[in-house]
């Protein structure tokens, strides 16, 4: 095959049957298929080139730019007093900083803007949501026992793992960010590394479902609560329980370890909130504030506030320094199922309900600052904040995982209520009550005061503006929907139809001067007492001259089209016609404005080739000195009749 180091240049030798290259789909195709594959080319991926993927619009929320901006800005900012204030314009989005930079203003971190809804192919309830310590991915625990990993910036699917044989009920990361512990309905505990490698499992940790997990500050111990009425403290290294706290008379639904102390709080089906000393294993205190099952308990990062949620639709805040209730939050209409403190603002937290609503609260305010009544179609089982604090994730019984972000400067206020959110083909630009969002007109121009751009009109083809905008003041009357097409706006002053014949000529003369404000030379045959308009007068789109539109050959011009050339026949005769004003500026106005007296003879037409002063006019772009004036072709029709000429 080789001769002198060169490859044989004859016909290519066929490959032996055993060395034939198999395609990626060879498992489904007979090797003796009657269309053999061509020669193998290592530089061409013939299989990958044939795959067609549908282009979809995907929204990405990246916090990198805000962090870079914060690093640049804090070099010269001594404190929050040196921080610049964001202006309510879209251009100010480049100046946004992370949530930690606005520690004195928690309202800047309200994550109520819907971003994305992630859905698994295996439709089942999402019981737990948990961000990775770096915030790059989100891990969800489902009713099917699967871990699903979603990208934390583009929210697309990354990986799915069958982690448990039964529904996952609890997940927690260690503070050193190296291990994750999960529990399921069968009472099994499992240890996971960052790469989702299962390193240890305890299948007899509890007799019933493990409802919640929490690590201590040193990561040497963690606690768990179960429906078997016990709270257990575990040695993390040995994975053995050191003590079992028995004091609840029923299922224990939630547990949380104090941020800095050896103190546990638990809430259960017996409507009690209990405090425990993990060193001695004894109960310290019981709080009897709720009248139904306590579903969630959370310590604040300051270590002094304790937040509890119950099926009685009430959220309570306790201060452990005085062991008294600080505040009750009432706003939910169904069971409060989940709670989450913001990582940067200690007074800001969110809550989820069994009716699918999510409320945003600030300590010191009784009512929710933001309420999203239809965030989910079913119960919100868990809420989790991104470590940076700009994203909120919610897992629900409606099988979806939803992401929420904070608003940018000049965002639509309706976005706060999730009424104009979504970006896919089904939900793009949706608004309540099937109200379609307005689209801006691509043609610039003046529009009716008080209306948006799409509700206004293009001058000359839509609803007319008021003749005197100053007469309306602050009380603008709405325009009826059945109003006929009108003319572009006229300058302030009385309407020409209300003036006498002599005043109409003066008014029309003023309009002709305003139609060419940039011509400093006087128009031909201009009266000597009229001066050219000053150069400081404002220009408006309806004041600019319009080019002449010629009709096609062999057709009559439309009635609304101004004509400045002579036309033979009965329409060109001026026997009994009254002088009329030019129609070029009042296009679309009522016909009575341009017609003469009712008893005047002759057809009501313009004197051809004459303007408002009964003198020849120069039409820009048509009969200027640089163009050769040519008579247009005669329109088809009968010759002029002498009888019509004298009538």
UniProtKB/Swiss-Prot annotation:
Residues 478-487, 496-519, 526-538 have a biased composition (Low complexity). GO terms for cellular component: nucleus. It is found in: Nucleus. InterPro entries: G-protein_beta_WD-40_rep, Pfs2-like, WD40/YVTN_repeat-like_dom_sf, WD40_repeat_CS, WD40_repeat_dom_sf, WD40_rpt. A motif (PPLPP motif 1) lies at residues 488-492. CDD domains: WD40. Interacts transiently (via the PPLPP motifs) with FCA (via the WW domain). Interacts with CPSF73-I, CPSF73-II, CPSF100 and CPSF160 in the CPSF complex. The FCA/FY interaction leads to changes in FY/CPSF complex composition. This is Flowering time control protein FY. It comes from Arabidopsis thaliana (Mouse-ear cress). The lineage of its organism: Eukaryota, Viridiplantae, Streptophyta, Embryophyta, Tracheophyta. The gene is FY.
């Amino acid at each position: 095959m080789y001769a002198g180091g060169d490859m044989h240049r004859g016909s290519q030798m066929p490959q032996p049957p055993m060395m034939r290259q198999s395609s990626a789909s060879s498992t489904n195709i007979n090797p003796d298929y009657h269309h053999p594959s061509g020669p193998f080319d290592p530089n061409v991926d013939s299989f990958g080139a044939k795959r067609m993927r549908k282009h979809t619009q995907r929204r990405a929320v990246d916090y990198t730019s805000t962090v870079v901006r914060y690093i640049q800005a804090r070099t010269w900012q001594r404190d929050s007093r040196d921080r610049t204030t964001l202006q309510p314009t879209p251009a100010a989005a480049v100046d946004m900083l992370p949530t930690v930079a606005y520690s004195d203003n928690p309202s800047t971190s309200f994550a109520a803007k819907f971003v994305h809804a992630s859905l698994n192919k295996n439709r089942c309830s999402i019981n737990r949501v948990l961000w990775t310590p770096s915030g790059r991915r989100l891990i969800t625990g489902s009713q099917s026992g699967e871990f699903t990993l979603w990208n934390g910036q583009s929210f697309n699917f990354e990986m799915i793992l069958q982690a448990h044989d039964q529904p996952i009920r609890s997940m927690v990361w260690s503070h050193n960010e190296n291990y994750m512990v999960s529990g399921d309905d069968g009472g099994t505990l499992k240890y996971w590394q960052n790469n989702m490698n299962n390193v240890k499992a305890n299948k007899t940790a509890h007799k019933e479902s493990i409802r919640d997990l929490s690590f201590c500050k040193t990561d040497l111990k963690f606690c768990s609560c179960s429906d078997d009425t016990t709270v257990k403290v575990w040695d993390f290294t040995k994975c053995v329980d050191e003590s079992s706290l028995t004091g609840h008379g029923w299922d224990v639904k939630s547990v949380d370890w104090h941020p800095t102390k050896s103190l546990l709080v638990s809430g259960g089906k017996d409507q009690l909130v209990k405090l425990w000393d993990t060193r001695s294993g004894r109960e310290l205190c019981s709080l009897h504030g709720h009248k139904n099952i306590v579903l969630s308990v959370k310590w604040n990062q300051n270590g002094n506030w304790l937040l509890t949620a119950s099926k009685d639709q009430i959220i309570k805040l306790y201060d452990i320094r005085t062991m008294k209730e600080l505040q009750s939050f009432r706003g939910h209409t169904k069971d409060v199922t989940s709670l989450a403190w913001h990582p940067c603002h200690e007074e800001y937290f969110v809550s989820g309900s069994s009716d699918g609503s999510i409320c945003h609260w600030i300590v010191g305010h009784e009512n929710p600052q933001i309420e999203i009544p239809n965030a989910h179609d079913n119960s919100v089982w868990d809420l989790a904040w991104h470590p940076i604090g700009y994203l909120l994730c919610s897992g629900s019984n409606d099988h979806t995982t939803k992401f929420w972000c904070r608003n940018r400067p000049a965002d639509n206020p309706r976005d706060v209520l999730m009424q104009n959110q979504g970006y896919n083909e089904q939900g793009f630009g949706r608004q309540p009550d099937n109200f379609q969002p307005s689209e801006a007109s691509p043609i610039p121009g003046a529009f009716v005061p008080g209306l948006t751009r799409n509700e206004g009109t293009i001058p000359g083809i839509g609803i007319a503006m008021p003749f005197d905008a100053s007469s309306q003041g602050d009380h603008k009357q709405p325009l009826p929907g059945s109003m006929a097409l009108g003319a572009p706006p006229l300058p302030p002053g009385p309407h020409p139809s209300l003036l006498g014949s002599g005043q109409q000529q003066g008014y029309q003369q003023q309009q002709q001067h305003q139609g060419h404000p940039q011509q400093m030379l006087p128009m031909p045959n201009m009266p000597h007492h009229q001066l050219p308009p000053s150069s400081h007068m404002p220009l408006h789109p309806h004041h600019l001259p319009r080019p002449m539109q010629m009709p096609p050959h062999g057709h009559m011009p439309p009635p609304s089209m101004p004509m400045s050339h002579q036309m033979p026949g009965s329409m060109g005769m001026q026997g009994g016609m009254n002088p009329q004003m030019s129609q070029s500026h009042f296009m679309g106005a009522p016909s009575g404005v341009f017609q003469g007296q009712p008893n005047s003879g002759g057809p009501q037409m313009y004197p051809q080739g004459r303007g408002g002063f009964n003198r020849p006019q120069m039409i820009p772009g048509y009969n200027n000195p640089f163009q050769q004036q040519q008579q247009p072709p005669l329109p088809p029709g009968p010759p002029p009749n002498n009888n019509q000429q004298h009538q």
